UniProtKB/Swiss-Prot annotation:
Renumbered ranges of motif 9aaTAD: 93-101
InterPro entries: Znf_C2H2_sf (IPR036236), Znf_C2H2_type (IPR013087)
Domain of life of the native organism: Eukaryota
Pfam families: zf-C2H2
Keyword annotations of the record: Activator, DNA-binding, Metal-binding, Nucleus, Repeat, Transcription, Transcription regulation, Zinc, Zinc-finger
Origin species: Homo sapiens
Protein name from the UniProt record: Krueppel-like factor 7
Gene of this entry: KLF7
Location within or outside the cell: Nucleus
Length: 302
């Protein structure tokens, strides 16, 4: 052990003679001495020298007088931004020098980190950037279905570059080395433009019909000169009755022979017989049998 003996050999023999055994547990003094030895082992002389030289340099910076060029620069600056007294100026300059030294030391420590960490961070950043570029188009948008580009991201960060393979339909594999987001976005846009040109040529110029609004309105009126388009077939049938003159909805009130082409017209007419007024104003107690009459009445309260 590196521990210094706290007893002499005679005291140890006397202790064995009196008690019959010798305790192997270290005493408080031995523990303290062992701690001192461990501290001296980990705290070598080189850090002490650096700290001592740094303290001496710090004293030189704190007690040194600022050069005249710094004083002239202080005088040229706005007096509201700097203190008036010269002593405070000297202290602020010394603090600036100290902060610059601390900044230099911190930058030096950061530069000593291994290059692998910077390479990993570079790869991680480029991975996030590539994910952001390739996820610019939502899955449900029509642009994705037209510009179908299968992307298989193959990253190789050996030389600090990232390789993105773009596989387009009816095209060969094209490996593009991406250096940043702008280059990746340009590559994806170019591939999309090629695919869009192919899709437009295949479809025969049906770009206007590919819009979501036009996809919904698929029910067109077949009568000559009519351009009405509806999203539901029932609405189309009700509209076609205006051309044919058909009125299948007959009023069931006794003695009434009115017929209508639409069911909502029959319901509105039936309220005249019953006197029902289901549309009530929120600002007053008036009720109406038709919703458009209520809308006209609501304009008075505005």
């Amino acid at each position: 052990m590196d521990v210094l003996a706290s007893y002499s050999i005679f005291q140890e023999l006397q202790l064995v003679h009196d008690t019959g055994y010798f305790s192997a547990l270290p005493s408080l003094e031995e523990t303290w001495q062992q701690t001192c030895l461990e501290l001296e082992r980990y705290l070598q002389t080189e850090p002490r020298r650096i700290s001592e030289t740094f303290g001496e340099d710090l004293d030189c910076f704190l007690h040194a007088s600022p050069p005249p060029c710094i004083e002239e620069s202080f005088r040229r600056l706005d007096p509201l931004l700097l203190p008036v007294e010269a002593a405070i100026c000297e202290k602020s300059s010394a603090v600036d020098i100290l902060l610059s030294r601390d900044k230099l030391l911190s930058e030096t420590c950061l530069s000593l980190q291994p290059a692998s960490s910077s390479l990993d961070s570079y790869t991680a950043v480029n991975q996030a950037q590539l994910n952001a570029v390739t996820s610019l188009t939502p899955p449900s948008s029509p642009e994705l279905s037209r510009h179908l580009v299968k992307t298989s991201q193959t990253l190789s960060a050996v030389d600090g570059t990232v390789t993105l393979k773009l596989v387009a339909k009816k095209a060969a594999l094209s490996s593009v080395k991406v250096g940043g987001v702008a280059t990746a976005a340009a590559a994806v846009t170019a591939a999309g433009a090629v695919k869009s040109g192919q899709s437009d040529s295949d479809q025969g110029g049906l770009g206007a019909e590919a819009c979501p609004e036009n996809k919904k309105r698929v029910h067109r009126c077949q009568f000559n000169g009519c351009r009405k388009v509806y999203t539901k077939s029932s609405h189309l049938k009700a509209h076609q009755r205006t051309h044919t003159g058909e009125k299948p909805y007959k009023c069931s009130w006794e003695g009434c022979e009115w017929r209508f082409a639409r069911s909502d017209e029959l319901t509105r007419h039936y309220r005249k017989h019953t006197g029902a007024k289901p549309f009530k104003c929120n600002h007053c107690d008036r009720c109406f049998s038709r919703s458009d009459h209520l809308a006209l009445h609501m304009k008075r309260h505005i």
